[in-house]
UniProtKB/Swiss-Prot annotation, chain A:
It holds the Pfam family zf-Tim10_DDP. One of its GO terms (molecular function) is metal ion binding. The gene is tim9. It is found in: Mitochondrion inner membrane. Mitochondrial intermembrane chaperone that participates in the import and insertion of multi-pass transmembrane proteins into the mitochondrial inner membrane. Also required for the transfer of beta-barrel precursors from the TOM complex to the sorting and assembly machinery (SAM complex) of the outer membrane. Acts as a chaperone-like protein that protects the hydrophobic precursors from aggregation and guide them through the mitochondrial intermembrane space. Its main location: mitochondrion. The lineage of its organism: Eukaryota, Fungi, Dikarya, Ascomycota, Pezizomycotina. This is Mitochondrial import inner membrane translocase subunit tim9. The keyword Nucleotidyltransferase does not apply.
Amino acid sequence: MDGLTAAESRELDQRLQKRQVKEFMSVFGNLVDNCFTACVDDFTSKALSGRESGCISRCVLKSMSTQTRLGERFGELNAAMTAEMQRR
Amino acid sequence: MFGLGRPQPTSAEKIAAVENELKVVAEMHSRMVKICTLKCIDKTYREGDLSKGESVCLDRCASKFFETHQKISDQLQKETQARGGGGFGM
């Protein structure tokens, strides 16, 4: 990839793995923030209500489907954009 | 080293260049997810599955996000060139 030596490639892989951990934590953090904001609005009890809990489960499922679907589209569009840039 | 050719980038520079390129793509991806979720996903979460309408909206949102990216990038390039490379105070 981009004319890196094996050692450079290994170094890059290590850095990318660290990034991936960070990225996962940020996706997880955003998920908590979004689903909490969308679903939790009743502070008359300290435990999540059945309604809130159900909402959170559905929010997580839907967000995962959203991530997957947008991930596919992003891959396609990014590949097309890269190809177009190289053609110019 | 011996005055031959242009200076070779160091290992650190080469790695940083690839890393940076990937970072730009990853950032664009996470911005798109955030924005298209806001634009398309019903916030009541009565359903755990994406509806047909939401799915179509996400696809179109992704497409338009890229088109907007390209359009603004082209326009900025044109403006910058028109101002003799010194556009937008950069």
